[in-house]
Amino acid sequence: MSLPGLELSQTSSEREFVPAPPTQITLSKGSEWRFEVAFGTAIRVKLLAGTAELFGTELAASQTYTFSGTKAAIYTWHGCTLEVSAGDTISTIDGLGPAGLNGEGARGYGAGGCQSEYTAEETPMVEYANVHFALEAMRQEAKATGKDGPRVLILGPENAGKTSVAKILTAYATKVGRQPIVVNLDPAEGMLSVPGTLTATAFRTMMNVEEGWGSSPMSGPSAVPVKLPLVYFYPLQNPLEAEGAVYRPIVSRLALSVTGRMAEDEDTRETGIIVDTPGILSAGKPGSLEIINHIVTEFAITTILVIGSERLYSTMMKNYDNKPTSSASAAASDERITVVKLSKSGGCVDRDAAFMKSVRESQIRTYFFGNPIPSTASAALSMSASSTTNVTLSPHAQQLDYDSLAVYNYTIASSDEDEDEYDPSQFGTSDTFLPKGSNDAEGPEAKHAEETSFASSVPGLGGSSGEDAASGSSAVPLKKVPPPAPNTLANSLLAVTHAAPNASPAEIRDASIMGFLYVADVDSEKGKIRVLAPIGGRVPPRAIVWGKKWPGEVVGLVG
């Protein structure tokens, strides 16, 4: 409709973003198609002819896969033809596309609206496949002799493709009927969980092409079988904070759980484990080699894969190659560590802070609300009558009395963090100005937190008794957050542990996680907080750890 004389008109459908027509991409034998898609936009990929795989998981022919907010590559061993088209705009955490209502500003000029896409002839996939075959030979030997399967540690700098290699090796193992345990030690992004967690998962079935590792259990149907992760909370940005004093005990507890699972499950024992690590451990910073040694010892690593760093490879060769493992059976079987250097894929790209922030927000949103991306592939696998499907979850909102909760927080100040935090809700409630400056909040619980040592809570530490002795006098930096509820609690995550509310700080630190709450609002005057929970009913009376420092504030998850 035009306004006479002014030549102004309302926005018409012709002015909105018009997707480009589908594009066919033909890949020759041994090549791959690399693509980047922004958050808020989506592309659709269909395999028309031949065979292809994404990080080791095969694509089904004539099924449409939807990708959003990803940097990935589709590889073909024998050649294939792909059809790429533009998908629907996906709402981001603030409810809009990344560049407005339509999201057209985030669409690129590549096929289907990719920000970047090209075909590469040189790939390291043959190297990665050879690693799989070598591991498979070790698994066959383990089955024949009764030994444990290979325990693989993947090291490399940031953006070197460590997680991609872990996915490829896991997908290839499940394809031949193996059941590997995959361990994620990178708190920067979660595996089948939210950021700030360390997880271990036994993979018995295929992974989800569109969602990476797949999905954890939910109250609804799933086209691909869900995975059951064991989750520990590490609400700090990297393992080197507090000189690894918090990270190492959690790794030890996770390793103990993995070892127990392997002792009870013959299939996982023969297959072994695959450990993915954060890139900061390969940056040569003080304390990183000590943490690597701790991981190698606790998980009794037999194979170390080094990607994209000659310096790190040289160090690992010097420290570990052909050295005995820490496994209990190493002395009897003469089990030794092997260090292998792998090429970094040319498709590895830098993921800036803005992209990683979007990744974290997407993982948190998916945990509470499900996957907003409509998938025709999932619809076909589930035999749904609709042409597309997406998993929509409905979290339960409820108000809680903060006084009834036992909320704990790690009192570790980062080097770039201002320790003087302003929180008006705390004024007028502290008795610091009373005679002698007494404070009931720092009573027996706080004193107990200061007196508890690491030595009482780290079971099964192999070959690191000297390190424990050195840290035995250190206190667990975990302190209870007294009422009233601080305003900074809003828009953050709370991890509900399996520990009792009055458990020691060491027990809370080492406890696995039941689930997570999202704090939508804080009413300090009434002493209540409004939270989102994945299930209904009252919150279990357990110790709760505040993810204040990591993953930090998540604004806009709810209105």
Swiss-Prot record:
ATP binds at residues 32, 71, 159-164. Residues 466-479 have a biased composition (Low complexity). GO terms for biological process: mRNA 3'-end processing; tRNA splicing, via endonucleolytic cleavage and ligation. Keywords: ATP-binding, mRNA processing, Nucleotide-binding, Nucleus. Disulfide bonds: none annotated. It holds the Pfam family Clp1. Residues 415-483 are annotated as: Disordered. Gene3D superfamilies: Clp1, DNA binding domain (2.60.120.1030), P-loop containing nucleotide triphosphate hydrolases (3.40.50.300), Pre-mRNA cleavage complex subunit Clp1, C-terminal domain (2.40.30.330). It is found in: Nucleus. One of its GO terms (molecular function) is ATP binding. One of its GO terms (cellular component) is mRNA cleavage factor complex. Its main location: nucleus. InterPro entries: Clp1, Clp1/Grc3, Clp1_C, Clp1_C_sf, Clp1_N, Clp1_N_sf, CLP1_P, P-loop_NTPase. The keyword Nucleotide-binding applies. The keyword Repeat does not apply. Component of a pre-mRNA cleavage factor complex. Interacts directly with PCF11. Belongs to the Clp1 family. Clp1 subfamily. Required for endonucleolytic cleavage during polyadenylation-dependent pre-mRNA 3'-end formation. This is mRNA cleavage and polyadenylation factor clp1. It comes from Neosartorya fischeri (strain ATCC 1020 / DSM 3700 / CBS 544.65 / FGSC A1164 / JCM 1740 / NRRL 181 / WB 181) (Aspergillus fischerianus).
